[in-house]
């Protein structure tokens, strides 16, 4: 098996086994495919990283687009529970399925808007989770 996730037809691959499943996953650079894909999918929660991917023309590469489609398994159990920030991560993963978004994310204005929305959501969550007692 090649270590490059885009070197094979991602849509035909099964998601990696989650930790504790007893599966003996091969390691790539010391990490399992589960760990590598988790790290990558979590990076998609960062609008600046999405802009970087767009600037490198990856978001117009059919193999990369197929890989993004394959990664949607992270939105379902049992994988969902491993994502640290599921809100922005899964929102961006869903948006990346749309060609218009993949084209528009090159815009610094969109990146900034997504960044500010993410910060606002984090602040709102904190206020709701830890209301002041004053």
From Swiss-Prot:
Nucleus as UniProt keyword: yes
Region described as Disordered: spans on this chain: 1-28
Chief subcellular location: nucleus
CC annotations in GO: core mediator complex; mediator complex
Subcellular location(s) per record: Nucleus
Coiled-coil spans in chain: none
GO molecular function annotations of the record: transcription coregulator activity
Keyword tags: Activator, Nucleus, Transcription, Transcription regulation
InterPro entries in the cross-refs: Med31_sf (IPR038089), Mediator_Med31 (IPR008831)
GO terms of biological process kind: regulation of transcription by RNA polymerase II
Compositionally skewed regions (Polar residues) per UniProt: 1-12
Short name of any one Pfam family annotated for the protein: Med31
Role noted for this protein: Component of the Mediator complex, a coactivator involved in the regulated transcription of nearly all RNA polymerase II-dependent genes. Mediator functions as a bridge to convey information from gene-specific regulatory proteins to the basal RNA polymerase II transcription machinery. Mediator is recruited to promoters by direct interactions with regulatory proteins and serves as a scaffold for the assembly of a functional preinitiation complex with RNA polymerase II and the general transcription factors.
Family the UniProt entry places it in: Belongs to the Mediator complex subunit 31 family.
Self-association state and partner proteins as the record states: Component of the Mediator complex.
Protein name: Mediator of RNA polymerase II transcription subunit 31
Encoding gene (name): soh1
